[in-house]
């Protein structure tokens, strides 16, 4: 029904105003839901093993498979002055502590000069054929800048340090938290002590649960 002169009645205007209010409320509620959902997801990703990465062949790998074990995460390179000694020491540590409770996880990075120019599969083949590497080598990543690999960014954020060169090493607990990190020049013998202690704790805990 229209009022005289063709203007909308007061009831029509009221309904239009009410509709606008309800629409605004619905939009606000929707925005809040999306924000809450986003925050909820971000809270769930709170440790290293919560992330997914790519292997050398580009396949998605959930780091959850390493939960419950000790991990030594390293940014590796094929053409560095540290390559041979580092790969050999890492392989020895990986073999010594065994894959039941410990793993070296290698992430190639090409942001440090020309020390890593090959493809991920070439890097993997190089490490295996030259140094007998049996630990996993993942897809080549970026560590610095806005395109940094999220899993590796978790490590650097945890220690508030960004690697300045190849072969920085991050020791990750069975729960996915960073225990300590080492610069390239620091001896692997120091890492061995820390990693061995964590592995022993895992074994003791399992024995107590029997």
Swiss-Prot record:
It is found in: Membrane. One of its GO terms (biological process) is response to oxidative stress. PROSITE patterns: ER_TARGET, GLUTATHIONE_PEROXID_3. It comes from the Eukaryota. Its EC number is 1.11.1.9. It holds the Pfam family GSHPx. This is Probable glutathione peroxidase 8.
């Amino acid at each position: 029904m229209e009022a005289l002169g063709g203007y909308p009645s007061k009831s029509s205007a009221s309904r239009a105003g009410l509709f606008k209010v309800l629409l605004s409320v619905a939009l606000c509620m929707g925005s809040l839901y999306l924000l809450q959902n986003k925050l909820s997801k971000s809270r769930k990703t709170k440790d290293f093993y919560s992330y997914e990465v790519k292997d050398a062949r580009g396949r998605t790998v959930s780091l959850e498979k390493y939960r419950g074990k000790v991990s030594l995460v390293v940014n590796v390179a094929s053409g560095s002055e540290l390559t041979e000694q580092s790969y050999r020491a890492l392989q020895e540590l990986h073999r010594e502590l065994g894959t039941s409770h410990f793993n070296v996880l290698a992430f190639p990075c090409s942001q440090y000069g020309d020390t890593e120019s090959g493809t991920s599969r070439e890097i993997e083949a190089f490490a295996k054929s030259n140094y007998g590497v049996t630990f996993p080598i993942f897809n080549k990543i970026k560590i610095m800048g806005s395109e940094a690999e999220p899993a590796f960014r978790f490590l650097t954020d945890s220690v508030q340090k960004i690697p300045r060169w190849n072969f920085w090493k991050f020791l990750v607990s069975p729960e996915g938290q960073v225990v300590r990190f080492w610069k390239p020049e620091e001896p692997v013998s120091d890492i061995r002590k820390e990693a061995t202690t964590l592995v022993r704790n895992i074994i003791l805990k399992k024995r107590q649960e029997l």
